């Protein structure tokens, strides 16, 4: 698999709707102020998180169980920024909707601006023929509250394309993946 450049990302997004909405360059300012950048970079695409957040709370003192997840463990917030409590996490979703080609795998890495503040972004790889808004998990590893900004860059997507003779036999769509076509912040499913 080879990593794909800005030219490929632009072409696939503009001609095939791989990323919508799509920003062909890097956006570093909004309303005359510097922001955490988003858009196309040399070998990736920096995504934004939407204004939709789910902040984890221990109000119910439950056990976190991915097979029997209690949605009451979250507080829903719609805002331009989100405060994550110390040693806790929040879920959000990308502004961008993705349609991944059958010969492509996408890996997500956190942006260094957040990582240097102790905020870690975790996302499972976007598999071939998956589509939807990406649910993002932000871990605040610090003993202090941490702030996330909506509509600014939060993570970078790296695109890897398989050789023509090595395309997967079964894609995410073929398997009927449980997160196919997700919109909004999506909680764990089994």
From Swiss-Prot:
Broad class of enzyme this protein falls into: hydrolase
Nucleotide-binding as UniProt keyword: yes
Superkingdom to which the source organism belongs: Bacteria
The keyword rRNA processing is annotated on this UniProt entry: no
Positions annotated to bind dCTP: 111-116, 135-137, 156, 172, 182
Transmembrane regions listed in the UniProt entry: none
Active site per database record: 137 (proton donor/acceptor)
Keywords of this entry: Hydrolase, Nucleotide metabolism, Nucleotide-binding
EC number(s) on file: 3.5.4.13
A GO MF term: dCTP deaminase activity
Biological pathway: Pyrimidine metabolism; dUMP biosynthesis; dUMP from dCTP (dUTP route): step 1/2
Catalytic activity, as annotated: dCTP + H2O + H(+) = dUTP + NH4(+)
GO biological process: dUMP biosynthetic process; dUTP biosynthetic process; nucleobase-containing small molecule interconversion
Record note on quaternary structure: Homotrimer.
PANTHER family in UniProt: DCTP DEAMINASE (PTHR42680:SF3)
Stated family: Belongs to the dCTP deaminase family.
HAMAP family linked: dCTP_deaminase
Function of the protein: Catalyzes the deamination of dCTP to dUTP.
Protein name: dCTP deaminase
């Amino acid at each position: 698999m080879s990593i794909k450049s800005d030219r490929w990302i632009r072409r696939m997004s503009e001609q095939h709707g791989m990323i919508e909405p799509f920003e062909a360059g890097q956006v570093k300012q909004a309303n005359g102020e510097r922001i955490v950048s988003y858009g196309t970079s040399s070998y990736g695409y920096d995504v934004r998180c939407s204004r939709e957040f789910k902040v984890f709370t221990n109000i119910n003192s439950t056990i976190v169980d991915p097979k029997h997840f209690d949605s009451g463990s979250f507080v829903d917030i719609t805002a331009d920024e989100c405060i994550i409590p110390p040693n806790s996490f929040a879920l959000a979703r990308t502004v961008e909707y993705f349609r991944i080609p059958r010969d492509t795998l996408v890996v997500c890495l956190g942006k260094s601006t957040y990582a240097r503040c102790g905020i870690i972004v975790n996302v499972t790889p976007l598999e071939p023929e998956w589509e939807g808004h990406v649910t993002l998990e932000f871990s605040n590893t610090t003993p202090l509250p941490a702030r996330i900004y909506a509509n600014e860059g939060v993570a970078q997507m790296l695109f890897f394309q398989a050789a023509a003779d090595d395309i997967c036999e079964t894609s995410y769509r073929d398997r009927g993946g449980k997160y196919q076509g997700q919109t909004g912040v999506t909680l764990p499913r089994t």
